[in-house]
């Protein structure tokens, strides 16, 4: 099972793909969090299977839909869980989308954005405390939208009962009914 998505355009794409291919001759089946349809690899296609990022009820057990809301939309940007803080002089294409979204909202939407505008990412309970204050959350993964590819943040958002918006090109509508995901 490999949790990091394998999407061309993600800064870790080559490293992630190399890791998957490393022991190809020893592995019978792969379970990854990206659609096998979009992966170009030396691994035989029949060995690659999609496995959505699981929600663990021991971790994602919040009923955030019950909490008082101060914000309309939550978004959190980070350079990856292993970094803790944003890298200096880093560039992330998602920031352009967020800037445009905020501009187009004409101050009619109250945003809670972590990882931009001088606000460092938050983790664990600090992250949950921020998330539960918003009516909805936006799930944008690095590398752009690709079929079924998402960071593990999708489990945190949906598993804690937050209405989640995701790019339609990720095709999660294959798994959810209308009204369950935006």
Which residues are covered by each model-predicted region?
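Active-site proximal beta-strand in glycosyltransferases
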Residues: 1-7
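Short acidic-hydrophobic, aromatic-tinged amphipathic segments that line or gate anion-handling sites
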Residues: 181-182
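Nucleotide-sugar donor-binding catalytic core of glycosyltransferases
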Residues: 9-178
């Amino acid at each position: 099972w490999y949790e990091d998505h394998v999407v061309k355009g993600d800064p870790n794409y080559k490293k992630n793909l190399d890791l998957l291919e490393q022991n190809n001759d020893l592995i019978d089946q792969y379970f990854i969090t990206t659609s096998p349809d979009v992966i170009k690899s030396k691994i035989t296609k029949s060995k690659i299977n999609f496995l959505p990022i699981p929600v663990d009820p021991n971790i994602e057990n919040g009923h955030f839909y019950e909490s008082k809301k101060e914000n309309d939309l939550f978004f959190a940007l980070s350079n990856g869980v292993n970094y803790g803080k944003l890298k200096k002089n880093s560039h992330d294409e998602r920031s352009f989308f967020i800037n445009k979204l905020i501009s187009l909202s004409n101050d009619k939407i109250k945003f809670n954005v972590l990882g931009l505008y001088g606000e460092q990412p938050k983790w664990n309970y600090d992250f949950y405390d921020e998330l539960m204050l918003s009516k909805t959350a936006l799930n944008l993964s690095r590398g752009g939208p690709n079929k079924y590819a998402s960071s593990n943040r999708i489990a945190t958002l949906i598993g804690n009962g937050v209405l989640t918006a995701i790019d339609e090109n990720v095709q999660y509508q294959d798994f959810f009914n209308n009204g369950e995901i935006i």
